[in-house]
């Protein structure tokens, strides 16, 4: 019972931590979260007092209120987001109405109007995600519209530019001659050829420089790895290899392989009485998880760390290993 209550309380604390990372701090201090924290404190106190069943009930209540707090926070944040978007859409729509956007952009204006209306109904019905979608549709509809005065000015400017361009074109056609056109073409072709040659030379230079840099990096990396490997091997020769993290079982008939004898191995634990630690970590790998006396040959066992020591690789019987700390 004590272990079960401790697990419940621990799981509750993890659960209570979730909204703190995903929600605004200002929303977290709500009625549900306050009750959740209060019940959590009661669960801990009653647990410490040895009242494990009472502690479990308080833990359950704390979890229920934590879930309600999470729902409340999500709904509040969704409402705020939707409200901001709807306000932005209404502001943009009011501006469009004042600028008589409906005359130049009747379709966009109508779409925005209907979207705001639909979004408002959804917001009033607490369908905040739907309201947010319609607010964005309204903003998108009016995103690229321009005031009527600006459109008229732009149209006049474009008309003047068009007429000027036509006049220039007629003048160029009048004074242009075939000879000038041919010379211009030759000049353009020559310029294009030289530019292509220059680009090719630059690309070749960059490629050669990049290849040289890559070769240098590869050589440096190879030298670094070789030095590290040499240092590692030298350390292994001096201190012995890092203790193994795995052990492949041989046979009982020849080698007397069992959890007791494996735990006795100096490279494992050097103590046969620690066989249960080895068994607990590997009971899912043996034919009968509740029978530690049956271990099949070729089974690869995991060797858990005993005192925080570093372990890696598969045990090799002919290798010198470092002693346990």
UniProtKB/Swiss-Prot annotation:
Alphabetized, the UniProt keywords read: Cell outer membrane, Membrane, Repeat, Signal
Residues in EAARKAAE repeats: 159-166, 190-197, 221-228
- Which GO cellular component terms, listed alphabetically, does the Swiss-Prot or TrEMBL entry include? cell outer membrane
List, alphabetically, the InterPro entries matched. Answer: Bact_Kbp
* Residue windows of the EAARKAEE repeats: 229-236
Topology with regard to the membrane? Peripheral membrane protein
Q: Where does this polypeptide localize? A: Cell outer membrane
Q: Where are the ARKLEEQRIAAQKAQEERKRAEE repeats?
A: 167-189, 198-220
Region annotated Disordered, chain positions:
176-224
The keyword rRNA-binding is annotated on this UniProt entry? no
Grouped into one coarse class, the protein's main location is membrane
Asked whether the UniProt record includes Nuclease among its keywords, one would answer no
Q: May I ask which residue range the UniProt record assigns to the signal sequence?
A: 1-24
Family membership, please give it.
To T.phagedenis TmpB.
* Role played: Tmp may serve as a porin or transport protein for large molecules.
Q: What is this protein called?
A: Treponemal membrane protein B
